[in-house]
């Protein structure tokens, strides 16, 4: 559509995503459950119900969407380091070149991502290039 209007393609195409990285799928699911569980008697749950009730969005806002800002769980960058690395590369293959990542607690989770996921992303990229030769 941009080309039809005589405009250049976007240089950057990105998305926001919340990362949950654990060594096992069981630990991933436990953390997901922890951050998306709301006590029905809590103010947070009341806020969610109020938001959903008053929302004029054309999409359903799930509890998971509400618990993590920017609907950060939708990109599904949760899993083991290898699962996340493969998903990142799959997004790259369709043109994504910017990730705005969310972590909590930020520093600790960023370290896990940097130490466990990023090296795998680089390794899998190299393997893909080698396989294409």
What are these regions (language model features)?
Residues 20-21, 77, 103-110:
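Acidic-and-aromatic substrate-binding clefts and catalytic sites of carbohydrate-active enzymes
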Residues 36, 115-118:
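Short, electropositive alpha-helical surface patch
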Residues 1-4, 106-112, 116:
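Active-site-adjacent beta->alpha loops and helix N-cap segments on the catalytic face
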Residues 1-93, 122-133:
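An alpha-helical appendage that flanks or caps ligand/catalytic pockets
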């Amino acid at each position: 559509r941009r080309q039809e209007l005589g405009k250049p393609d976007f240089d950057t195409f990105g998305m926001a995503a919340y990362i949950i990285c654990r060594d096992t799928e069981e630990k991933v699911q436990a953390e997901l459950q922890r951050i998306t569980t709301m006590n029905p008697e809590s103010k947070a749950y009341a806020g969610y119900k109020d938001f959903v009730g008053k929302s004029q969005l054309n999409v359903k806002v799930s509890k998971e969407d509400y618990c993590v800002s920017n609907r950060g769980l939708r990109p599904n960058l949760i899993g083991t380091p290898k699962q996340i690395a493969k998903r990142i590369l799959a997004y790259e293959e369709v043109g994504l070149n910017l990730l705005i990542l969310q972590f909590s607690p930020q520093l600790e989770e960023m370290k896990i991502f940097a130490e466990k996921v990023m090296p795998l992303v680089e390794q899998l990229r190299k393997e893909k290039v080698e396989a294409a030769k």
